[in-house]
Structure formats: structure tokens, C-alpha cells
């Protein structure tokens, strides 16, 4: 799948090695994109007019869990679906195009979804519900677009800190969780699931 035009290739600093599932551990790639491309993506997602949707829960719907109402009220985030259900989301065609260089660098054969996730500072670091991106092996890529003290945690104790321009690759069927942050206004993560 050759989708990157020659003028777009300079946006990727380091290309992960193609790996077949299952990924046995989390692989970290720092400085994945060029600084120029990171700033470009930040200008899209941190723009005041960028449309975000409110989600009252992170991970799973809390109706089936034993989390208290107080905890439920703090487990929220903003989401923007870019690609889902085998197609770009209608109002996100231009946003989707911005990810073509990333998808080629990840050697995506079949894209499942791309979502932008915005976790708002709530003055305390909140660990969200552990979840799976899918109940079957699937490649998961998390691209962190700002620095914060938030992180992605895994059941084995592995923590991936939110460092701007860091890419974390793992099997999305491995249980993991997100957090809020306390040292920045927000925590911005791009979540890509693919084969």
C-alpha cells in the first residue's frame, strides 16, 4: 500500500519494524515524527474550533461494573473519531488524510479505527477502568501529542509515560488503562487500531 507522496516522507523520523501479532511487549519509539509534523498535528487537535465529543466513561460502559457514582463522575474524556467502521468519519476526511504517512510507516494492512482522545486535567491523577481495544489480537498504536504526568498502564505493571512524539505499539487485546494528568491542562493521545 503506497500512499505516501515523496513530499510527505520527511514527516516520519523512525519507522517501526513490521511485527506480526501478537506483540509480546510494549515497544516504544521516541521522536517518531518530525517536530514540524508534531506541531502540525497539535495545531489541528488543540484548535479551539476542533469538534470534540463528550464521553461520560473511559473504556467500558460503567453500568456493568462496581465503580461508585463518585468515581464514575470523574471517568470522562473527550473523543474525536477519525476512522471507524471501515471508513473515515464524514466530518473527518481532511483529518484522516493527515494520518496517511503514519499509517504507511506502521505498515497498516487493514485499518480498524483512529481516535483522538483528550483527557482533561481534574486536579488529581485518575486511573481509568482497565479495558481492551478488542477481545482478539490487534495492533494498537498510541501516539502522545503532548507532555504530561499521565500514562498508559498495563496489568504487568508496565507504564508508558505521556511524552510528546512518543509512539507505543502493543497488542490491543492486552488489558490496559489510561489516566488523566495534573501537570498540564490536558493529555492528548491518538489511538490507532489495525492489522
What are these regions (language model features)?
Residues 118-120, 145, 194:
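Short beta-strand segments enriched in hydrophobic/aromatic residues
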Residues 160-176:
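Conserved metal-binding segment of the jelly-roll/cupin
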Residues 129-130, 175-183:
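Short beta-strand His + acidic residue motifs that chelate non-heme Fe in jelly-roll/DSBH
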